[in-house]
Amino acid sequence: MFHASADMLPSFVTVPLLVPTCPPPGFPRLLVNALTSVVGYVAVELRGAHSPDPLPSFTFDLSTRIKGNYIARAASWRQGGHFTQSLAGLAGKSVRVAARIPGAKVFSLTLECTAGKEVKSS
């Protein structure tokens, strides 16, 4: 495992990206194309377009760590007793994506609309 302070972990922050507005019943979500080592991971948080601070429901602490090899893995965050992929509350707004990537490579990030309703997992 990585035992470094969060400030020391490999990371990046994107330029502002527009979260799409999706026709019902779809919702916007963030897809990650990444490859991690056995102990590596990708953790994602969302920030305001012009702020270094994370958006309250989309912090690194609430992010599900992505581990493995994925072409299009949906990022998710813990909200209450379940995990959500939906960015519906951010539709039409610009956000910056911050990622911590110890032992990982991120090849692309995609903001997309889904075709159906979200099924929340616990």
Residue ranges and their predicted role:
Residues 1-122:
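Beta-rich accessory regions
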